[in-house]
A protein has these predicted regions:
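The feature captures the beta-strand-to-loop junction immediately N-terminal to the Walker
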Residues: 90-92
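Helix-to-loop junction immediately C-terminal to a conserved catalytic motif
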Residues: 105
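Conserved ABC ATPase "signature" region
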Residues: 166-184, 235
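Conserved ABC ATPase signature
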Residues: 188-192, 196
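Conserved catalytic motifs of ABC-family nucleotide-binding domains
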Residues: 209
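Catalytic Walker B motif of ABC-type/P-loop ATPase nucleotide-binding domains
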Residues: 213-217
Length: 295
């Protein structure tokens, strides 16, 4: 029965996710691994030029470069995230921020540079192996298993990570309560609103105990009334001690929930700092935010 359930869940994942853009890039097995994760334990602190982790700690990308047909897309970009903080990767369309984000997730390979997780080099690891080490990834596209209920979406991941049934159900109840989705636990995922779907996706990602979560356009497809839900979810993640890396085109909403931001412009880091420092920087205002922007 358990084998049958596992196969059913994997088949449903395949059918549900085949329309997503990320599947075209990574294949079903890699995206499944990115959603189920894997993972463990520690991180750290740091200071200015990378006000994130000190060397050997946290999720750190150094000197990333990527070109397509000899056209440089990113030039010497370094990004760091420590546990318990949210970092935003922002910039104009075509600036290279999405390329940087995808190099960190493992969706695309860097031409040069390194990516480390708590000091361990993961630069050459595929996406699914990064997931096993504790890097969770939520794509922009809906990734819920639509034919499953809310609780079965989360249980599907717990079955891969928690052998004991009683402990599995205890963890399930805890995640349903923490993300305030107990009242919809028996609802089919296909019937969820945008905000509810994001709650379920994040709860399911946490079932795998990741150290870091990478959020790709978390505000996309979300009604204005649900934006506050996303803010609360990110706060919950950092309060749990997870590091969060966000890339999104919704600048104001992103700046309101992060601790630090990096502004990518023309393939390099134009500015790194707190949201207040970012907004006050004249170059950032001139090239990206606009002179009238305010938080």
């Amino acid at each position: 029965l358990q084998i049958h359930q596992s196969l059913t869940i994997r088949l449903q994942a395949t059918l549900t996710l085949m329309s997503g853009n990320q599947v075209k890039r990574t294949g079903i097995s890699s995206l499944w691994a990115s959603l189920t994760g894997g993972g463990a334990r520690r991180t750290a602190n740091g200071s200015k030029a990378a006000r994130g982790p000190a060397p050997g700690e946290g999720l750190v990308a150094r000197h990333l470069r990527k070109s397509y047909k000899r056209r440089p897309v990113t030039r010497d970009v370094s990004v760091s995230v420590r546990r318990g903080e949210a970092v935003g990767l922002l910039g104009p369309n075509g600036a290279g921020k999405t390329t940087v984000f995808y190099m960190i997730t493992g969706l695309i390979a860097a031409d040069s540079g390194t990516i480390t997780l708590d000091g361990a080099d993961i630069t050459d690891l595929p996406m699914y192996q990064r997931a096993r080490l504790g890097i969770g990834y939520l794509p922009q596209e809906a990734s819920v298993f639509r034919a499953l209920t809310v609780e079965d979406n989360i249980r599907a991941v717990l079955e891969l990570h928690v052998p004991d049934k009683a402990e599995r159900e205890r963890r399930l109840r805890g995640l349903l309560d923490e993300f305030q989705i107990t009242h919809i636990q028996h609802s089919p995922a296909v019937a969820l609103s945008g905000g509810e779907r994001r709650r379920v996706e994040i709860a399911r990602a946490l079932a795998a105990n990741p150290r870091f979560i990478l959020l790709d356009e978390p505000f996309a497809g979300i009604d204005p009334i649900a934006i506050n839900d996303i803010r609360q979810l990110v706060r919950q993640l950092t309060t749990r001690g997870l590091g969060v890396l966000i890339t999104d085109h919704n600048v104001r909403e992103t700046l309101e929930i992060i601790d630090r931001a990096l502004i990518i412009h023309d393939g390099h880091v134009l500015m790194e700092g707190t949201p207040q420092e970012i907004v006050a920087n004249p170059d950032v205002r001139r090239l990206y935010l606009g002179e009238g922007f305010s938080l």
